[in-house]
Amino acid sequence: MAGASAKVVAMLLSVLATYGFAAGVVYTNDWLPAKATWYGQPNGAGPDDNGGACGFKNTNQYPFMSMTSCGNEPLFQDGKGCGACYQIRCTNNPSCSGQPRTVIITDMNYYPVARYHFDLSGTAFGAMARPGLNDQLRHAGIIDIQFRRVPCYHRGLYVNFHVEAGSNPVYLAVLVEFANKDGTVVQLDVMESLPSGKPTRVWTPMRRSWGSIWRLDANHRLQGPFSLRMVSESGQTVIAHQVIPANWRANTNYGSKVQFR
């Protein structure tokens, strides 16, 4: 019995290692030290195209509202950190308000200046200032801040799937966005349908292409409608049944009616 139990544990650990699942996200009241810089327009969302290395689009609009950040590797995690929410605050500059502000990881920071480095949008950096001192704080350039991971709550939104440009009958690339709670997705699986439209009940793992975009390179013509199964960093599984229709198109959004709780 003990031997069998050990084998089961070993199998579970193997699965966790294969899919890169974390043991879970720990949300605490503790603050950690970090450095913050900013880039782009003073009141912008960071990149000029309102995008970033996570693949999110229109980060100047809700739910991002330009409150975005590049993260260095401990935050970006080669794309696994895309969509995570953090509270940040600054206290050691005369222009700092000391009030926490929430930002979302949407991009990669290639110039780490500390163990944790938030390269913020101009909007997010200025949001840490006292009223009327946004520009004065931005003139500091680089400041010490504190941060902590917090749950994401995109009020009024369900998880959205964007079939990326270039997708075709044997290649499917999907951006996952607006996930609540952890904000991140660590595994995405797809279920095809039979010609009749009924689901095959067979899940096929997709692999992370880059950022929050997942891909499937198929050896056959893919048959929709497609169901998508997401696993969050905390291990919660959410399924969007037949969310992408049989007559799907590339470069198109497909909204779901599911959300992480």
UniProtKB/Swiss-Prot annotation:
InterPro entries: Expan_Lol_pI, Expansin/allergen_DPBB_dom, Expansin_CBD, Expansin_CBD_sf, LolPI, RlpA-like_DPBB, RlpA-like_sf
UniProt signal peptide: 1-24
Lineage, uppermost ranks: Eukaryota, Viridiplantae, Streptophyta, Embryophyta, Tracheophyta
UniProt function note: May cause loosening and extension of plant cell walls by disrupting non-covalent bonding between cellulose microfibrils and matrix glucans. No enzymatic activity has been found. May be required for rapid internodal elongation in deepwater rice during submergence.
Record bears the keyword Transit peptide: no
Compartment list: Secreted, Cell wall; Membrane
PROSITE patterns found in the cross-reference section: EXPANSIN_CBD, EXPANSIN_EG45
Record-annotated Expansin-like EG45 domain positions: 51-157
Gene name of the encoded protein: EXPB2
Family per similarity comment: Belongs to the expansin family. Expansin B subfamily.
Name of the protein in question: Expansin-B2
GO cellular component: extracellular region; membrane
Domain of life, per lineage: Eukaryota
CDD domains (alphabetical): DPBB_EXPB_N
SUPFAM superfamilies named in the record: Barwin-like endoglucanases, PHL pollen allergen
Record-linked Pfam families: DPBB_1, Expansin_C
Cysteine disulfide links: 54-82, 85-152, 90-96
GO-annotated biological processes: plant-type cell wall loosening; sexual reproduction
Residue intervals of the Expansin-like CBD domain: 170-256
Keyword set, alphabetical order: Cell wall, Cell wall biogenesis/degradation, Disulfide bond, Membrane, Secreted, Signal
Membrane topology recorded in Swiss-Prot or TrEMBL: Peripheral membrane protein
Tissue expression summary: Expressed in roots.
Species, as recorded: Oryza sativa subsp. japonica
Keyword Cell wall biogenesis/degradation part of the UniProt annotation: yes
